[in-house]
């Protein structure tokens, strides 16, 4: 065995010939002999072209460039890399051929070049699909937009539970949010039997994380569920019984994370609901499914924001959209004698022209949600309407003063009677010409956090208020969660019940209640197609909407076939209807007067 020649920068290249160099390479590669004479590919592991034997005119003797120039023209054959896999063989050939600045030429002896070997190698790779994973769809758009905008994308995942988050995620930076989700994943994995631990050796949590994370809810831990992601909500339900475990509107989701290197099989998102308040929900997504799930959630957020930009609707005030979840969102409040908004800023003066001139300006005007104070205030069971992000860019009736703004005839709300509509002296109107520039800057601005909702606030602050849309004007921007009209079968079934009063106002219904346990079901006068359960508990009247925007009759715990099924179930079993921490017991039905 010949000793391998070492390269020395002080060595004169004229001492060592090219044959010695190729001989040392052949000994280290496969033991075959290399010569400039005619040779077959099977006998020589390296084929040397004629250009490789020529000396580059620019490279002086003994230079490193001269050596690299010769080695770069060496072509690999399959015999020298027999022990490597197909993928490693391809990478090695690409690296060696890629280092050459000039194209490789065929050997002058007529031997076949290595280029025709590429199809054989690719065919071998096709025959061995286990060498490389199958290609995945791009992260930006993993599914068709119509599917996410419509019924949604469904995944079968494992629900591990949730942990209460005691602080608003909006008040924390991106790094802290990520630490919270990682800590929540670790705690749930340790508490759920059979769950794969996210971290084998986990450091004890810091005091800050311990103060942010609260109690855990493991009621449905370890259950296989169907996760449906759409622009409307994230719906978690059992595949067999279709029992709803959680249904979080996109506006109630403040942060989502998943597919990190150390938590590759887990997705965590923070959302608000009336059962768990603000909580971090953990999903186990095996076989690389976490990347697809988190990509679909991000796509739903992006499409939802684009939908809002294309079809902006009435925008509630910021302090209305940021009300606390602690308020009982499923219950109605009493009528206010005075308007809740009263401009009492001492240093502000009304604009010239007085109150009437301000209202009669031709500029577009959208009445505030509190303008309808005193009318019926309706909430959806199992839906959270008091969160950070209101239903700003979907045509859903947001009930704060409980009047459906899309059921009001067009033109009647442009000029309100004197003394009813509030006027503001500190408003600022942005010209319509400035709106496209604001939208383009918001889209082009870099966002480190994919689920950071700050662009929504910026768009809301810069969005000019448009006129109130009627039903005829809102056909082009139909909401996927708009209330459905009741069918004839439901109305016929309700007419047979003695506790159904028909169409009745809130005030009239409260007048029929005398003691705790009295209840009735009525058809709302301000919200067409809505049915309200009115009952008395602890001497106070409560009003609950029985049908959600999708037309499902449900409470937060169960889905029912009809309104009669819901009422009779709670009446016969004496089970209270729980909503936002309070209870409503159905004991004595208020019968309809004939």
From Swiss-Prot:
Gene Ontology terms describing biological process: cell surface receptor protein tyrosine kinase signaling pathway; central nervous system development; epidermal growth factor receptor signaling pathway; intracellular signal transduction
InterPro entries (UniProt xref): CEP152/SHC-Transforming, PH-like_dom_sf, PID_Shc-like, PTB/PI_dom, SH2, SH2_dom_sf, SHC_SH2
Top-level taxon of the source organism: Eukaryota
Signal peptide as annotated in the record: none
Annotated Gene Ontology cellular component terms: cytosol; plasma membrane
Amino acid composition bias (Polar residues), ranges on this chain: 393-405
A Pfam family it matches: PID
Ranges where the PID domain occurs: 149-334
Residues with Phosphoserine modification: 402
Coiled coil: none
Biased composition (Low complexity): 101-124
Gene Ontology MF terms in the entry: phosphotyrosine residue binding; receptor tyrosine kinase binding
Spans annotated as CH1: 335-498
Region Disordered: start-end pairs: 98-147, 351-373, 386-405
Modifications the protein undergoes after translation, according to the UniProt entry: Tyrosine phosphorylated.
Entry keyword Cell cycle: no
Tissue distribution: Mainly expressed in brain. Hardly detectable in other tissues, except in pancreas. Highly expressed in the cerebral cortex, frontal and temporal lobes, occipital pole, hippocampus, caudate nucleus and amygdala. Expressed at low level in the cerebellum, medulla and spinal cord.
Alphabetized UniProt keyword annotations: Phosphoprotein, SH2 domain
Location of the SH2 domain: 499-590
Summary of subunit composition and partner proteins: Interacts with the Trk receptors in a phosphotyrosine-dependent manner. Once activated, binds to GRB2. Interacts with activated EGF receptors.
Function, in words: Signaling adapter that couples activated growth factor receptors to signaling pathway in neurons. Involved in the signal transduction pathways of neurotrophin-activated Trk receptors in cortical neurons.
The name this protein goes by in its record: SHC-transforming protein 3
Native source organism of the sequence: Homo sapiens (Human)
């Amino acid at each position: 065995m010949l000793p391998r020649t070492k390269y020395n920068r002080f060595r004169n290249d004229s001492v060592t010939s090219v044959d010695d160099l190729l001989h040392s390479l052949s000994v280290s590669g496969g033991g075959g002999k290399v010569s400039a004479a005619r040779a077959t590919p099977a006998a020589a592991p390296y084929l040397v072209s004629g250009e490789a034997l020529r000396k580059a005119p620019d490279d002086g003797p003994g230079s490193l460039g001269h050596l690299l120039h010769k080695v770069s023209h060496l072509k690999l054959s399959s015999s020298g890399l027999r022990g490597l896999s197909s993928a490693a063989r391809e990478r090695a050939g690409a690296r060696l051929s890629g280092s050459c600045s000039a194209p490789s030429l065929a050997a002058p002896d007529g031997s076949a070049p290595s280029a025709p070997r590429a199809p054989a190698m690719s065919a071998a790779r096709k025959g061995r699909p286990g060498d490389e994973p199958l290609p995945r769809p791009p992260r930006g758009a993993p599914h068709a937009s119509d599917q996410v905008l419509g019924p949604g994308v469904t995944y079968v995942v494992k629900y591990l539970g949730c942990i209460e988050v005691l602080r608003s995620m909006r008040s924390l930076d991106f790094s802290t949010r990520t630490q919270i989700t990682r800590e929540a994943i670790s705690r749930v994995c340790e508490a759920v039997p059979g769950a794969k631990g996210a971290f084998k050796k986990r450091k004890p949590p810091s005091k800050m994380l311990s103060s942010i994370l609260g109690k855990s809810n493991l009621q449905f831990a370890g259950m296989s569920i169907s996760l449906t992601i759409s622009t409307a909500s994230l719906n978690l339900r059992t595949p067999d019984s279709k029992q709803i475990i959680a249904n979080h509107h996109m506006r109630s989701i403040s942060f989502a994370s998943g597919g990190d290197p150390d938590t590759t099989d887990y997705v965590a998102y923070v959302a608000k609901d009336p059962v768990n308040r603000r909580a971090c929900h953990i999903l186990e997504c095996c076989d690389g499914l976490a990347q697809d799930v988190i990509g679909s959630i991000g796509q739903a957020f992006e499409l939802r924001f684009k939908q809002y930009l294309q079809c902006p609707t009435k925008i509630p005030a910021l302090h209305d959209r940021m009300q606390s979840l602690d308020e009982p969102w499923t219950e109605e409040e009493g009528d206010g004698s005075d308007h809740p908004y009263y401009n009492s800023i001492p240093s502000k003066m009304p604009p010239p022209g007085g109150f009437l001139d301000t209202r009669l300006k031709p500029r577009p005007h959208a009445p505030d949600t509190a303008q309808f104070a005193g009318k019926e205030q309706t909430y959806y069971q199992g839906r959270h309407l008091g969160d950070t992000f209101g239903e700003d860019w979907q045509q859903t009736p947001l009930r704060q003063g409980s009047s459906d703004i899309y059921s009001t005839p067009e033109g009647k709300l442009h000029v309100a009677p004197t003394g009813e509509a509030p006027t503001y002296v500190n408003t600022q109107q942005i010209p319509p010409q400035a709106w496209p520039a604001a939208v383009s800057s918001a889209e082009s601005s870099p966002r480190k956090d994919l689920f950071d909702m700050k662009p929504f606030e910026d768009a809301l602050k810069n969005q000019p208020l448009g006129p109130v849309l009627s039903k005829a004007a809102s056909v082009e921007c139909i909401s996927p969660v708009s209330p459905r009209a009741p069918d004839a079968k439901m109305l016929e079934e309700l007419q047979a019940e003695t506790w159904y009063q028909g169409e009745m106002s809130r005030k009239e219904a409260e007048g029929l209640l005398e003691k705790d346990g009295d209840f009735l079901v009525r058809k709302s006068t301000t919200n067409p197609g809505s049915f309200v359960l009115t009952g008395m508990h602890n001497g106070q009247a409560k009003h609950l909407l029985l049908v959600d925007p999708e037309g499902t009759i449900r409470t937060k715990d169960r889905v029912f076939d009809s309104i009669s099924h819901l009422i009779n179930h709670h009446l016969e079993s004496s089970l209270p209807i729980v909503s936002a921490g309070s209870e409503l017991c159905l004991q004595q039905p208020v019968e309809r007067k004939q």
